């Protein structure tokens, strides 16, 4: 049994970054990528489960995670890709568009023979994970979750990212130990802009 402090699960993302002048570049992104750097910097033994199309299969191996600690999944669709179009030079306002979304990470795709203190779901948009993956992982260790992976949804016509409430939140919140949400996401979840009240409601769930 291979043991990790943190096991991070998510999609590789090919980011397109456009500045306010419309000039652009592509970069490797995704919460699973950046979270692995942060977890390693904290001295943790880190494993990652990362999903992409076959043509991007080798990209995760440039990460500082040891090769034997990278578990790659084949996406049945494309590699997730997101465009961030910044509207000002300070990068404070932007339009985010889903160019492609990888296939859902399912319970059946979780690797065998590993255990972790924390399983981090580093999602990018709704549909990244099969919902029941939360309950399954909570039986194995503590679950950490970024709410953008459950609230952020591509608009069917424009593909711009919009936010919708999670209708199964009260069913799954008791299985989450570490929850990351910003003020806007917390208001969508709870219906209140009062941060303390929003935090209280989420803890009660």
Regions found by a protein language model. Give the residues of each.
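Short internal beta-strands
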Residues: 48-52, 144-148, 180-183
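Active-site metal-binding loops of divalent metal-dependent hydrolases
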Residues: 10-12, 31
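Anionic group-transfer/hydrolysis microenvironments
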Residues: 13, 124, 148, 184
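Histidine-anchored nucleotide/phosphate-binding helix
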Residues: 31-41
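Conserved N-terminal subdomain of the carbohydrate kinase-like
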Residues: 2-5, 14-26, 41-122, 127, ...
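Short gly/pro/ser/thr-enriched loop/turn and capping motifs at secondary-structure boundaries
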Residues: 79-80, 150-153
